[in-house]
Amino acid sequence: MKRAFIMVLDSFGIGATEDADRFGDVGSDTLGHIAEACAKGEADNGRKGPLNLPNLTRLGLVKAHEGSTGKIAAGMDGNADVIGAYAWAHELSSGKDTPSGHWEIAGVPVLFDWGYFSDHENSFPQELLDKLVKRANLPGYLGNCHSSGTVILDQLGEEHMKTGKPIFYTSADSVFQIACHEETFGLDKLYELCEIAREELTEGGYNIGRVIARPFIGDKAGNFQRTGNRHDLAVEPPAPTVLQKLVDEKQGHVVSVGKIADIYANCGITKKVKATGLDALFDATIKEMKDAGDKTIVFTNFVDFDSSWGHRRDIAGYASGLELFDRRLPELMALVGEDDILILTADHGCDPSWTGTDHTREHIPVLIYGPKVKPGSLGHRETFADIGQTLASYFGTSPMDYGKNML
């Protein structure tokens, strides 16, 4: 029975890539800078001491980081016995965003340039805004700028509740984000607005990767909170991913846990499981792993590393999340059967010590574990698509156009 379990620690980069200068990210290192802060006692908020990731270390994380950066992360064990295969991978795609990273993991790098809204104020074309107001029958809109999602709620959340005007904002990513109050505006109404925005962006030729619904609750600035009902409306990958090939060619199954289905625009997904928060995502993943039959991929995105700690530049929170993940990792490893493979990886970096609030262009870890996987270094990989090609070979689908089999 062949099954693959893919766990994406969203934004968990392990050192700047060779082309990081194109992105202003030379020197970025999500893992390294978190470990450094922990070792100095600068991340003792809710946790204490050096970064403690014994299980990820045994799977080769510290070695992969050393391969990427040339140094061992502060306070971590560079001499631990390694029981998995490990690598550090460079991104072939032109961006450092979520869809590009995930699509490339599944064998389809993004070799075109996304469209972006680069103006920090008055970010969106007036023609687009006018169409949204008219089609969705809106009283107007707020925002129309670049912003952190939590900051803009404190700035405009109360006005949104009073006026019913949705909050439109973007970032350095190829995104159009809409924040609305779940109760006063309504979740269904927000989703409908996002569908309209997706249609207008596509028909207008803006080439924007995602429209993101950002629902929130609360009654005043300072206590607004985003909920787990986020919904991403992505464009479809430009070619069949390994997920699609497994379903189409082998009548296989692909289970999405968390936001995976949204990222792939539901292409190649046979079952969707929603969960919010690290523990809930872990619980859902464990249940799906236990239920998984032959020719199945269980694919989970642990979004909190990116959304809750990376973008918010919360080093202690990120460290605490990693330690929780590591504590629970043996539960996943115990479910890996004789012919199964477990792959732990990331989709980009988001160094919480870095300037600004955006992603960072970094190598990602590729940690592969299974009874038949030979432990040791798989070296520097030229593309995340090596993961997709490895899965294509493992399941016996037609090969992907990019990437090399690592096993």
From Swiss-Prot:
InterPro entries the record matches: Alkaline_phosphatase_core_sf, DeoB, Metalloenzyme, Phosphopentomutase_DeoB_cap_sf
GO molecular function, one term: manganese ion binding
Lineage top rank: taxon: Bacteria
CC per GO annotation: cytosol
Pfam families given in the database record: Metalloenzyme
Free-text comment on the cofactor: Binds 2 manganese ions.
Keyword Metal-binding: yes
Main location: cytoplasm
Cofactor entry: Mn(2+)
Top-tier EC class: isomerase
Catalytic activity: 2-deoxy-alpha-D-ribose 1-phosphate = 2-deoxy-D-ribose 5-phosphate; alpha-D-ribose 1-phosphate = D-ribose 5-phosphate
EC number: 5.4.2.7
UniProt subcellular location: Cytoplasm
Listed GO biological process terms: 2-deoxyribose 1-phosphate catabolic process; 5-phosphoribose 1-diphosphate biosynthetic process; metabolic compound salvage; nucleotide metabolic process
Transmembrane intervals: none
Binding annotation for Mn(2+) 1: 10, 347-348
Residues annotated to bind Mn(2+) 2: 306, 311, 359
Pathway(s) served: Carbohydrate degradation; 2-deoxy-D-ribose 1-phosphate degradation; D-glyceraldehyde 3-phosphate and acetaldehyde from 2-deoxy-alpha-D-ribose 1-phosphate: step 1/2
Nucleus among keywords: no
Its job: Isomerase that catalyzes the conversion of deoxy-ribose 1-phosphate (dRib-1-P) and ribose 1-phosphate (Rib-1-P) to deoxy-ribose 5-phosphate (dRib-5-P) and ribose 5-phosphate (Rib-5-P), respectively.
Assigned protein family: Belongs to the phosphopentomutase family.
Protein name: Phosphopentomutase
Organism name: Salmonella arizonae (strain ATCC BAA-731 / CDC346-86 / RSK2980)
Gene: deoB
